[in-house]
């Protein structure tokens, strides 16, 4: 059980509450506890949390940023706005998801295909476009620029980068794989989609956003460009050293620099929870992978947890991090925003997941070794408890198990100190998937954790045979064979 320090008064915790019911005080306390731990040690940190449960919105603000009107950069969550506009265009029958994107670009772009396979509109929103991560490309700065100066250099590259520059550089893009196959983060795809939507609707992107989203939802503090009378509400962003960071240049706003506050984002999440809306429902459908394990919607990451479908996304900029979690069938959502970047994504996602789990599951349910995994893992655990952990193959007979989930479950056991049980599950996975280099790599780690160096070496070598490009195996073998 996780324990939290009783230091709430010292942190200037402030919470604004909606009308309470019998259950919300416990939820409020959980948020307070989580926030206390999060903020401790960072005097610059502000934190805003919105929780939606049973159609009630609860908003909490903590630390140095203490108002639900404070503006944060929301990073890549901006892409879900653009995705929603594309879904609206589909519902309006202005476009089809399998349309070649070049139908909506002025000029000739023969390069935006791979072996005759074009980039389609769908690929721009499910991370499979094969477009570069950023334009202008700043990857060359890595290793050449002081990390503390990197953000400022990137801003310099972008501050005079125009729409014309973007489409000029788009001519030079070379795809390295068939679009639609490999998920890969791309701010370029997000920015390009906004430009295409402008061509489709013959309106500026900012006007489209106001017409179909922010205006409709009365999101008066959500902007691509913050108006002068609201600039005082824009929080300062920091890295994990407490150094103030620059804001993202507005020319990439549709991809990763919308500014908003917790009040507006709570309205947005409430809108996203209503899947009676055809456009919303479309954005939550798996277009790559599946919701049972891991899937991609329209810039939404999809999964399932204890039989409940989850829809989530995170966003980072140079000085801000945000995370949102939706559980549509329970009408539950969490939005968390903070003015710090640096190892914050995992902290925010863990906070959101903890709030969800502690709200809907008992302590006994949460203590199960299979908690959070599919029914198949629950069935396997039941059989293992009956037959013994040294009979994994027999216990797994007749159960449809996913390699990645079994691997993740084994690592979960490892994190909870169950080293031998984790190794047993790693062994099961290699038995089920004898041609998987990753399964052997994981089993090698399992042997390493129980102190069996000889077998760790054997299985890392086997993993390397299956995939000579497995750099982790190379690194571990060098360490183990010293």
What is each of the regions a protein language model found here?
Residues 32-35, 49, 55, 73-101, ...:
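Active-site SXXK
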Residues 429, 462-463:
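Canonical positions in the second alpha-helix
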């Amino acid at each position: 059980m996780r324990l939290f320090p009783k230091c709430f008064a010292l942190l200037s915790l402030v919470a604004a509450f909606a009308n309470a019911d019998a259950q919300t005080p416990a939820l409020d306390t959980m948020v307070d506890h989580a926030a206390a731990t999060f903020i401790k040690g960072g005097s610059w940190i502000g934190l805003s949390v919105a929780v939606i449960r049973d159609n009630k919105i609860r908003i909490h603000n903590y630390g140095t940023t203490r108002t639900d009107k404070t503006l944060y950069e929301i990073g890549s969550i901006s892409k879900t706005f653009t995705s929603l506009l594309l879904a609206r265009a589909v519902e309006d029958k202005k476009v089809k998801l399998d349309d070649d994107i070049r139908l909506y670009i002025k000029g000739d772009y023969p390069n935006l295909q791979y072996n005759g396979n074009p980039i389609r509109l769908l690929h721009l929103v499910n991370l499979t476009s094969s477009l570069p991560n950023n334009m202008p490309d700043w990857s060359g700065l890595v290793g050449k620029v002081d990390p503390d100066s990197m953000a400022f250099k990137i801003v310099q590259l972008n501050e005079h980068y125009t729409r014309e520059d973007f489409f000029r550089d788009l001519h030079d893009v070379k795809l390295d794989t068939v679009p639609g196959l490999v998920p890969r983060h791309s701010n370029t795809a997000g920015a390009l989609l906004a430009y295409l939507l402008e061509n489709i609707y013959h309106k500026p992107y900012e006007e489209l956003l106001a017409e179909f989203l922010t205006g409709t939802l009365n999101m008066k503090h959500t902007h691509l460009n913050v108006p002068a009378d609201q600039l005082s509400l824009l929080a300062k962003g920091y890295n994990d050293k407490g150094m103030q960071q620059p804001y993202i240049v507005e020319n990439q706003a549709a991809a990763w620099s919308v500014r908003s506050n917790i009040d507006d984002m709570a309205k947005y999440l409430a809108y996203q929870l209503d899947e009676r809306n055809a456009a919303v429902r479309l954005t939550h459908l798996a277009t790559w992978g599946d919701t049972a394990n891991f899937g991609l919607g329209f810039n939404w990451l999809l999964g399932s947890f204890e039989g409940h479908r989850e829809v989530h996304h995170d966003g980072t900029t140079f000085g801000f991090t945000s995370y949102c979690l939706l559980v549509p069938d329970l009408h539950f959502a969490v939005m968390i925003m903070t003015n710090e970047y640096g190892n914050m994504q995992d902290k925010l996602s863990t906070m959101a997941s903890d709030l969800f789990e502690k709200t809907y599951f008992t302590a006994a349910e949460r203590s199960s070794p299979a908690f959070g995994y599919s029914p198949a893992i629950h069935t396997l655990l039941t059989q293992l408890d009956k037959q013994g952990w040294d009979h994994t193959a027999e216990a797994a007979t007749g159960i449809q198990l996913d390699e990645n989930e079994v691997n993740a479950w084994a690592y979960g056991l490892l994190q909870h100190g169950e080293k031998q049980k984790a190794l047993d599950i790693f062994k099961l996975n290699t038995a089920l998937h004898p041609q998987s280099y990753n399964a052997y790599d994981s089993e090698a780690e399992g042997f390493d954790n129980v102190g069996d160096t000889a077998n760790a070496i054997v299985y890392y070598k086997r993993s390397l045979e299956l995939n000579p490009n497995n750099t982790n195996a190379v690194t571990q073998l060098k360490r183990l064979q010293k």
